[in-house]
Regions:
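Conserved catalytic core of the tyrosine transesterase superfamily
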Residues: 1-201
Length: 201
């Protein structure tokens, strides 16, 4: 997790994020996303509860360092649904983004109720996930793929060509490709790729 984010974390949130990274084995990027989602939520809660000065300005300026168990215990399912509405209407978040934030909230409150036992009732236990549009995957035709490979030029043409071949033939994610090191290339012409959750594939 980024050090800058740690400095913004109240103790309860710092403990949770440490747990997800060290015990649950989530990647640093995933933990950062959890933090951003929870920070957005608690900034919203502080705003609707009148717990931040009017002069604070945009919610990006609202500190969550003072978020404690008393505030967390006051959260209701209705608060969360209003937050989801705020994300859609004010922040124009897509259903996919809202679904991720729903997951972040579910995991945090489950941690507090089932693991830490500091909450008697999980306010998001019955939280519905925003419905997501499911579209067909987009792909390049063979001609488009060939044209893309033929367009590679410049000082790093060989590297770029190899990267495109891996993208096209292996279906790698961007982070998976960026994470490949020389030691991942084996003498038997195979490649180890570390996927989400640091899983080898």
């Amino acid at each position: 997790m980024k050090k800058a984010y740690l400095q913004e974390c109240p103790p309860v949130l710092r403990e949770y994020l440490g747990y997800t990274e060290t015990i649950k084995g989530r990647s640093g990027n995933t933990v950062d996303e959890y933090f951003i989602d929870l920070r957005t939520f608690f900034r919203y809660i502080k705003q609707i509860r009148g717990l931040c000065p009017a002069a604070a300005g945009p919610d990006e300026n609202i500190s969550i360092l003072d978020v404690d168990m008393a505030l967390i215990r006051s959260v209701t399912l209705n608060d969360v649904y209003e937050f989801m509405n705020y994300l859609k209407t004010e922040r124009h978040n897509t259903s996919k983004t809202r679904a991720r934030k729903t997951t972040s909230l579910r995991m945090f409150f489950r941690y507090l109720t089932d693991y830490k036992h500091v909450l008697d009732v999980n306010p998001v236990q019955n939280l519905d996930t925003p419905k997501q549009k499911k579209g067909l995957p987009q792909y390049l035709t063979l001609d488009q793929s060939m044209a893309l490979l033929q367009s590679v030029d410049g000082e790093f043409a060989q590297r770029d060509y190899c990267m495109l071949v891996l993208f096209l033939n292996c279906g790698l994610r961007r982070a998976e490709l960026a994470g490949i090191n020389l030691r991942d290339i084996r003498p038997d012409h195979t490649l180890i790729v570390r996927g989400k959750g640091n899983k080898e594939r």
